[in-house]
A protein has these predicted regions:
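N-terminal alpha-helical modules
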Residues: 21-140
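Bacterial N-terminal signal peptides
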Residues: 7-18
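Positively charged n-region of N-terminal signal peptides that target proteins for export
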Residues: 1-5
Length: 140
């Protein structure tokens, strides 16, 4: 596993495990509207990336649930296959995301903005994928 991926995993894991704490950085004296340094900026960017990832996971689960429901109701004869393809597509998308954001990290590796740039990449791609899934599966 590459260093950028390890850092991203640690940052996202920390956010997911401490979502209640991370949701309110003000309790830590951090103003995400005006972070006072790189570390605070990175923490805030990590929170935003975690929120985008959580939303993506929820929409992905809705899409799979919709496909299973339509297959069970007989409304879609190929929905079981569509769900399998969606799973494969999501796994491939995750690899694409990781490689894209690792490249962003590497490009910024000599500066202090590398973690923030990677978190921005993860956030942007997660939001884009969430929109795609909503559009493809007509989810609200």
């Amino acid at each position: 596993m590459t260093l950028p991926r390890v850092l991203a995993s640690v940052a996202l894991w920390g956010c997911l495990c401490g979502a209640a704490i991370a949701a309110d950085r003000s309790a830590e004296g951090i103003d995400c509207a005006q972070p006072s340094g790189t570390m605070e900026s990175d923490l805030c960017a990590s929170d935003v990336a975690s929120e985008a990832d959580t939303e993506l996971n929820a929409v992905y689960a809705q899409a799979r649930q919709q496909l299973r429901r339509q297959a069970a109701e007989g409304a879609c004869t190929h929905c079981a296959d569509a769900e399998k393809q969606l799973i494969l597509a999501q796994r491939a998308w995750m690899q694409l995301r990781d490689h894209d954001c690792d490249a962003v990290y590497a490009f910024n590796a000599d500066g202090t903005s590398r973690n923030g740039a990677q978190m921005h990449c993860l956030t942007t791609l997660a939001r884009d994928r969430t929109r795609q899934l909503r559009d493809f599966y007509e989810l609200l």
